[in-house]
């Protein structure tokens, strides 16, 4: 029997959930809801309902919340009370307290509560994490991320920290298998909006791994890069293209003493890996389905999303105070 799925929010992100839901085996998309209507024309023969209560009345087994972050808590709590498994788009909520209420509601109901950190489904990062776990880099020393793009007209309720940096916070801890211990950040609002549109952050993960994040909405091109440096080389993921490259430390001795002293390590071979490139959102949908069916547990849990929110709030706190925050 197929899982009866409903989607709340069919705007800029929700429309992609609609497309992927229709292509996911074992899932029957039966209801859509958005008070703003179907501005992207994705509903097809499905009526567009007014809100979460009507979605629940449609008899759904599972739901995806792709509404603005400010609406996540009320919608998620209503779905949990109705016994509906739910995937909430990132971030889980506007605050740690709200996120905790959501997490507790789904845990109390014995329901699957997943969160949409889609970068975990990116082929480049999946392979990067696997190679790190297998010891290809040896001891991990540093993780650096860049997430830059032009200003998105669709985002108005949060700034770059909760909309974009939340991805990098999640993927850095996930790839390294190490939680954040401290973070320091600075933010700036240059576009005239209430929320920040630029952020730089540096911190330390468990085990002494250094991490830094560069995020903004003011770059006239899209940049999605993750660099993990270890004792044996560096892995570089271009998550916009799904590419992964390994830069190995060289083994041949350098004869030019001045260069050898400056570089610290020598350059070795460069390998770009051939990866099977599926749309990450399709895999996210399959993982959510499998969790509901009890045949998989690779979805991002609400506990993990709550840990992410703690780091995100620490970033904003650090930016406001000008001081490092311990976690």
Regions found by a protein language model. Give the residues of each.
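A contiguous active-site-proximal alpha/beta segment in oxidoreductase catalytic domains
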Residues: 70, 93-155
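C-terminal glycine/acidic-rich active-site capping loop/insertion
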Residues: 118, 232-303, 327
